[in-house]
Amino acid sequence: MSLSLYNTLHRRSEPFEPLEANLVRMYCCGITVYDYCHLGHARTCLIWDVVRRYLQWSGYEVHYIQNFTDIDDKILNRARAEKSSMGAIAEKFIEAYFEDMEALHIQPADEYPRATHSLDGIQKLIHDLEQRGFAYASQGDVYYAVRKFDGYGKLSGRKLDDMQAGASGRVNEDPDAPKKHDPFDFALWKAAKAGEPAWDSPWGAGRPGWHIECSAMVRDRLGETIDIHVGGSDLIFPHHENEIAQSEAATGQPLAKYWLHNGMVKVEGEKMSKSLGNFITIRELLKKYDPMAVRLFILQAHYTKPLDFTDEALTAATKGWETLNDALLFGAEHLDTNNITADKGILAKFKAIVDNDLNFSGGLAILFELAKELKKEKNILVHEGKLQQNPQILASLWLTLKELADILGFVPETKQQAAGLTDAEIEDLIQQRKDARANKNYAEGDRLRDLLAEKGIVLVDKPGGITEWHRE
C-alpha cells in the first residue's frame, strides 16, 4: 500500500504522488507573533513535524517552510499596551516560539520567512494581480476582486451567493466597505496609519494584508506549485481560500497539489483560542507534564479530528509515555545490538497503518505492543537475573521500537536524567532493599524505598517477593 492523504481541496483521500520524484515541497502557515503559543499551536506544529519525519523516513527529501506573521493589528496592540515596538514584540515571541518548539522536540523548519523580510515578493505579487485585473487600488489600499476569480470557494465549499445572503450586517460594520467594489473583496495592501509602521510601495506607504504574505512566501521560496500546504482547520476559510485565489490568479497554476488540515484542540467542546480565554500556554503545560507525554497525547488522536484537552487525558498520556520510556531505556542498557537490525515485518506493518492518511494514532499501538514485550522481559531479568527470550530477538524488537519512536519524535531518558539513576542502579537499590528486608532490617529497607521515592521511582511490592517499579 502506498501513502494516501485526505485532500481538503477534493474532500477525499488520494494517493500521494509528489510533483518531483523523491522531493516534497511543504509549507505550513505559522503563528502571528504577539503572544506565547498555546496547546492548539503545539498540536499544529507537532503534527506537521511528525508528517515531515515520516516522509523523510519513507525516503523523501522534504523542503519545509513555516512563516512568521510579524505585521498585524494584534502585534501593534500588544506593542501599545507594553509601550514597546512592533519589532520588539515580534522578536520576543519568535524567541519564545523557538524555546517552546525545542522543549517539544520539534525539528526546525528549513526556513522561517517573515512578512517584514518578504516585502519585495509581496509587492511583486500584488503588482502581478493588478496587471491581470484581479486587484485594484482604492484610497491608498489595494483590494483583491474576489468575484473575478471563478474558483473562489473551491477549498472551503462556500459559495459567494450563499454567503451574501447573511452578510448585510457585517458589511455595515466594515469600516473599509466604502473603499471596496464588492463587500467580499479583501485587502492586499493597507494604507499607512498614523503611529504605525509603514513601508513604501507603488500605491503609497502602508503594510501588507495577512493573506498575501503566505502566497508571496510560497512563490518566492518553493515555487508556483508546491506538493503539500498544511495548517489548522480554522485557516481553511478565509485564509487558505484567499491564498488560492491570490496565487492561482497570479500564476495560472495550482498553488498546492494537496491541502492537509489538522483538527482543533477543544476545551469543553469549544476551540481552544486566545480570543475565548480558554487556552493553556505550552510553557505552562510543560511545568506540569513531560514534553513527551504531551507529544503522545497529541498523537493519540487522528490529526484531522478534534482533540479534547483534559488533565485526565494528559495524566493517562504520562503513564503511556512511562511505558514507552522504560522500554526504550531497558533496551539501551541491557541489550547488545551489534550486528542486529530492526524487524522489517513490524516496520512494514507500521508503514501500512500510517500510509492510510497518516494514521499515527493507529501506528502507536505497535509501539505499545513492543514496549509491553520488553517490559515483561525487564521484569524477568530483575527477578530471575536472566532473559527469557533470545537476546538477539529482543535486541531486534528494541531496535524496531527505537526506530518507530524516532519517526514519531519521542526522545527517551528525560526522566532518567532527571532522576539521576540508570535502570541498573535502580535495580541494584531494589535488590539491596530486598536483602535488608530478608535480614529483617526494615529500617534500611524503608530508607532505600524513601531514597528511590525522592528520585521519582515508585515501588510496587507484589506477592511472591516480586517488586515492580516505574518512574513518576
From Swiss-Prot:
Keywords: Aminoacyl-tRNA synthetase, ATP-binding, Cytoplasm, Ligase, Metal-binding, Nucleotide-binding, Protein biosynthesis, Zinc. It is found in: Cytoplasm. GO terms for biological process: cysteinyl-tRNA aminoacylation. The keyword ATP-binding applies. A motif ('HIGH' region) lies at residues 31-41. Monomer. NCBIfam families: cysS. This is Cysteine--tRNA ligase. It comes from Picosynechococcus sp. (strain ATCC 27264 / PCC 7002 / PR-6) (Agmenellum quadruplicatum). The gene is cysS.
